[in-house]
Amino acid sequence: VTTWTDHTADRPISLTAPSGIDRAAHHRLDEAWLAAAWSHPSTRCFVVSGGQVLIDETPDGATELVMTPSFEAPLTEAHRYFLGTDEEGTSFFALQKDSLPGRMDQSARPAGLREAGLLLSDRDAGLMAHAVALENWQRLHRFCSRCGERTVIAAAGHIRRCPACGAEHYPRTDPAVIMAVTDGEDRILLGRQVHWPEGRFSTLAGFVEPGESIEQSVRREVQEEVGVTVGPVEYVASQPWPFPSSLMLGFMAHATSTGINVDGDEIHEARWFSRDELGAAFESGEVLPPYGISIAARLIELWYGKPLPTRGAF
């Protein structure tokens, strides 16, 4: 597998750029340290609820997470997750609650990761992705998979422990491959899932199966979904996608066949596009580009040679 690191350096994919946060995993089991960090006046926290946070606009027009000093944040009916520290030693926590707090001013508003990830700084986007992933995992794994008893939160949100049998459960991450497939004529293969509306096309993707390498997964998914055979596979970049717990592994893949035979179960339609054809389809509205935060958009851009239009993006 070769990599496209040089091609992505100038425009890093959303949620992959360095966040400047040290996750400091060695502190997660240190209750005394966590208590001291929580009570420190520099510590900041924010609320996550249902995959959303509050964001606000700064005086200079940037967008940031709405955070408060931790000592001002009540822990009533909230789960506390330690997210890490920055270079200045500031600690960051997320509070999982049933609802977001009341807006602090008229400009603050709730936002999910798909929207906020495009607007926030690398630091804030990384903190939000971490918090949303933990919230999703906590919500879906409340009971022990070994004995069925209810588990409790440990390690500042990064472990669920079963008091009944002693089992420890860790946050789940599901690897998935996503690939921009091109052919000998340098066309790109895009597909439309069965539940997507007309015009919504993107790169092919699928989960890695047990006992399978990521390269094997790329070739299998393309063959299963559209009947196209893939040869060389080139790794590009990865992207956390906590909806609820995926890690997207992005590839460029070269097809050794071009005949399309969609499976009808996952993919309803698939087409080869030249750059001119795709550009014209974007312009006419025949094809809607993927949303800018997604690794799918960046994979297509690497082939397309320029940013995708934002009008009509999904």
PLM features: residue spans?
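Surface-exposed, charge/polar-rich loops and edge strands
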Residues: 212
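Conserved hydrophobic/aromatic beta-strand scaffold that supports enzyme active sites
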Residues: 82, 143, 178-180, 190, ...
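Hydrophobic alpha-helical positions that pack around
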Residues: 204, 218, 222
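N-terminal strand-loop-strand
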Residues: 160-202, 207, 229-230, 253
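Active-site-adjacent beta-strand/loop module that shapes the phosphate/pyrophosphate-binding cleft
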Residues: 239-262
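Cys/His-rich short segments
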Residues: 130-182
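Nudix hydrolase/Nudix homology domain
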Residues: 1-141, 152, 196-201, 263-314
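Short, well-structured beta-strand/strand-turn elements
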Residues: 152-155, 227-236
